[in-house]
Amino acid sequence: MTAFRSGLIALLATLALDQASKLWLYFGTDLVMTQPWRLAPFADFVVVWNRGVSYGLFQQEGGLGRWLLVAVSLAAVIGLSVWMRRAGSRLLAVALGLIVGGALGNAIDRAAYGAVFDFVHLHAGPWSWYVFNVADAAIVAGVVGLILDSLRPAPRAPSTDVAGNGGHPQA
């Protein structure tokens, strides 16, 4: 399987899991009326509509801000997809696929509802993490993959020594 195909599978799986989880939790359950749902002592399902970007930054109430964020997301998707198509390693392609799938999932929410549906809340005692969704988790995992790929040694280029002299000039 090519690196690109692996990245494409990661992209499509991320997008499908993200949208399915959001649609099921919002339209297929009574979470909106009965939240929070306690999953574990440190995790709940809740309903949060994020009108901003990561960590709730740049909250947008108006239509222009909403569509500007959709446009920026789609521009990033295009650029990262081109990079994924040219990726030289499976790790890089999968990392980019996770990021693109997550960005598309959140852009779909923003275009359809005016905000991103976040629902996973992790906490322990007084500590509380921001509320996120499958797309956000995939984006973070993709960034970790990008970092790991950047730390890998570059593959050595094959020797171009045709003359058999070890690459040294002739005397």
From Swiss-Prot:
This protein specifically catalyzes the removal of signal peptides from prolipoproteins. It is found in: Cell inner membrane. The active site is at D118, D136. GO terms for molecular function: aspartic-type endopeptidase activity. Pathway: Protein modification; lipoprotein biosynthesis (signal peptide cleavage). It catalyses: Release of signal peptides from bacterial membrane prolipoproteins. Hydrolyzes -Xaa-Yaa-Zaa-|-(S,diacylglyceryl)Cys-, in which Xaa is hydrophobic (preferably Leu), and Yaa (Ala or Ser) and Zaa (Gly or Ala) have small, neutral side chains. Its EC number is 3.4.23.36. GO terms for cellular component: plasma membrane. It is a multi-pass membrane protein. Belongs to the peptidase A8 family. It is an enzyme of class 3 (hydrolase). One of its GO terms (biological process) is proteolysis. This is Lipoprotein signal peptidase. Keywords: Aspartyl protease, Cell inner membrane, Cell membrane, Hydrolase, Membrane, Protease, Transmembrane, Transmembrane helix. The gene is lspA. Its main location: membrane.
